[in-house]
Each structure stands twice: as C-alpha cells, then as structure tokens.
Design a protein with these regions (language model features):
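Acidic-basic catalytic patches of nuclease active cores, encompassing PD-(D/E)XK
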Residues: 1-73, 79
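Generic structural signal for short, flexible, solvent-exposed coil/loop and linker residues
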Residues: 6, 84, 107-110
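Surface-exposed cleft-lining segments at the edges of enzyme active sites
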Residues: 43, 89-97
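Active-site beta-strand-loop-beta-strand hairpin of nuclease catalytic cores
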Residues: 75-90, 114-116
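Catalytic cores of nucleic-acid endonucleases
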Residues: 96-128
Length: 128
C-alpha cells in the first residue's frame, strides 16, 4: 500500500482545513491515496510515473464526487456546501519525470485559488 511520507502546509493551510470544514475531505483524500494495493511489476516501464498516475486517476473516478479536468487546469477538485457556503479542494498529481511541470501545477492551483474557485490546493508528488 502506498504511504504518505511527509506533509508540508503553507500559509496556514492546515488551520484553513479546520476553519473551512475541509478536514474530512482531506482525510478522504489521504485514504484515497493510500488505501489500495500498489504492486511492483518486474517489467520495463510497468512502474513508471505514468502507470502510477493512471492508478490514482482510476481511484478518484471509482470513489466518485471528484471532478476531473484532464488538461489545462487542476487535475481533480471536490467541493462541499457547508451551512450554505461552498468550499473546494483541488488536487494536482505530479508523477512525471519532468520537474519543470511542478511549477505549472503550482500555477494552476494558484490561479484557481486567486480566482475564488478553490479554497485549498494540494500537490501529490513521489517521495523518492
């Protein structure tokens, strides 16, 4: 099973999860990312970032409630309405070998937060 090796929160995000009522959604996200069997296949190109990315995308689709934007924006978003207020969490999954794509993911999240479509952004990256 995959595990979360580290979490880094910026600009009060950890407190924002509680204040906006997104903690449960955060916990659901962590479960989605870790509660499945990730098998290592002894074949060339079987365990690359693209294969792992497909596994994560399949998990988001299976769980349901997550909206996917395949290109040009945040990969996955989920929103709740709490006491009449809509709050949203956005996820970028970065498993590409190209490190320059990470800044593009940061830009996507920043744009969505700045424009008021997201309240919290998350980037998922491999630990090693």
């Amino acid at each position: 099973m995959p595990k979360i090796a580290d979490r880094t929160f910026f600009n009060g995000t950890n407190q924002k999860l509680d204040r906006l009522g997104l903690r449960k959604l955060w916990e659901d996200l962590e479960a989605l990312l870790t509660s499945f069997e990730l098998l290592v296949v002894e074949a060339r190109n079987s365990n690359g970032g693209a294969a792992v990315r497909v596994m994560f995308d399949d998990r988001f689709r299976t769980v349901g409630g997550w909206e996917n934007r395949p290109t040009g924006g945040v990969n996955w978003t989920k929103c709740y309405t709490i006491n009449g207020t809509r709050v949203c969490l956005g996820i970028e999954i970065q498993f590409s070998a190209r490190s320059d794509l990470l800044i593009v993911d940061v830009q996507h999240l920043r744009d969505e937060i700045t424009e008021g479509r997201l309240d919290v952004g998350v980037i998922v990256v491999p630990s090693k």
